[in-house]
């Protein structure tokens, strides 16, 4: 994915310059800071909020390619996997996954970020970095646990079940209510911790009549999409 990161950073820098090299409040940014931001993005060095190379002024880790924050945490997850997580037994991994699930649920339900949702991790400001780690570590550990213990079950129409379930879950609007607990946080925690892992299990258990050769023939198109 890193070639795409570089491409996105270059396009971000070009777009920022075409827009006049200004932040949201109209402050002009020196070209040297834009080039420094580009270099940091290419080498995946996150920007500190308020730093000169945090050119957009929103506190983003990667102002020239905002979505890179997600891949940044995935890189951290892979490093942790290589150093520690892959050594864990199934029982230890299950305990870790449960603890991370409880931590993530608490973060969302008690609205630790103050956002009313799990939309954290895009900045190093405040609780965002810790929240971003939780957002990455729980699904990462849960995915490993599912992979190690996966046993397909017989389910007819797995594709349609999963598709309808996802459309239904994604159709739910933001849920108001922040006291005593965050209603929207409860819903998002349910989706991430319970619903999505179950859907992954069901989807992996499904069968298809499409051949592997047919899928390979359309691989390039799928990547572009």
Predicted regions and their residues:
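Membrane-interface helix-loop-helix regions
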Residues: 4-73, 103-119, 126, 190-204
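Generic hydrophobic alpha-helical membrane-span motif
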Residues: 6, 18, 79-80, 149
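Alpha-helical transmembrane segments in multi-pass integral membrane proteins
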Residues: 14, 50-54, 84-88, 119-216, ...
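Hydrophobic alpha-helical segments of integral membrane proteins
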Residues: 38-42, 75, 79, 83, ...
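Function-critical hydrophobic alpha-helical transmembrane segments in multi-pass membrane proteins
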Residues: 60-85, 132, 136-138
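Small-polar-interrupted transmembrane alpha-helices in polytopic inner-membrane proteins
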Residues: 94-111, 162-167
